[in-house]
Amino acid sequence: MTGRRCERTTSPGTGGRLRAEPADFQVQEVPAYLPGGSGEYLYLHVEKTRHTTAHVVRELCAQLGVRDRDVGVAGLKDRHAVTTQWLSLPAKVEPRMGDFSLPGVRILETSRHTNKLGMGHLHGNRFVVRVRGAAGMAEQAGETLATLAQGGVPNYFGPQRFGLGGLNAEEGLRVLRGESELRDPRVRRFLTSSVQSAIFNALVSLRLEREVFDRLLTGDMAKKHDTGGVFLVEDAGAETPRAQRGEVSATGTLFGRKVKPLTADAGALEAEALALFGLSPQVFASRKGDRRLIRVFPAEAEVRPEDDGYVLAFTLPKGSFATSVLREVMKTEVDAPGAGPDTTDEGEAGDGE
């Protein structure tokens, strides 16, 4: 169960294969700021192959004698890739860094800064993805990618959020209905976040089906792409031209106690998505909730042909999934390797927490 996910583009797909080896899928974190060079925190620029962020953090703690809560990260990265990101540690461990060793992990750079790195302290992620088994399809890939860069890509949660076959969301539904025997609060939060994500995906799909993906509805909470400002749409006719120019987009609700459901036309569509799961907003009272853009715009989009396929490169805002772009270009479903609480996605953790 991942929530319905209609495609935005109607162009032919390229087909192909992903992740034949880790280097085929590269994720480079785009930090919100760089370390200033001085301060009480040691910043590490780390390259990881076949390691989740959480596993590297655990190894740092074990080898350097620090607590998990003392390690700062801006986002959690997938295991099945080559990923680069910054981490922070108390500066007191710097003399012991020479003792740290983990196969598949390289420290590219170190510096100092005045504050601990916090979750979400990044602008986004740069993806470089090799698609194999798609010889001669680079031009088609480029055309679809250009369409997405111009008009936006559905900001779906990727299959990594749901586990193989969508089992995480199915178990999350049982948790919300009081039918699960799971007691670990961390696992329960992770599973219920999968349900939040599936409902959001269903809402985005409904907006595509009703041809209001790039429009605004009365009652929408819209977000400005340049400043991040959020506002209530009271006159959809007056605001929709801004959406069609890509200046603003609608947001969808990740249900929780601190987020009010939408009203008017937007609220009716959102209620329809929620009804697909047989739930009410009240069952998410244990979650804070959040709002999430229904579309994002791939930036710095490029395609390079290769003998056996092509390489895609693009940048997405934090929290967005490369798989949303890939499924539009390839027109195939992308698998969900090893999804779990420590391997959230190529985007970031924390939506709707």
Curated annotation (Swiss-Prot):
What PROSITE patterns does the record point to? TRUD (PS50984), UPF0024 (PS01268)
A GO molecular function held by the record:
RNA binding
Q: Region (Disordered) spans which residues?
A: 1-21, 332-353
Against Gene3D superfamilies, the record matches this protein to: TruD, catalytic domain, TruD, insertion domain
The TRUD domain sits at 152-296
Q: Which HAMAP family match?
A: TruD (MF_01082)
| Identification of the protein by name | tRNA pseudouridine synthase D
Report the gene name: truD
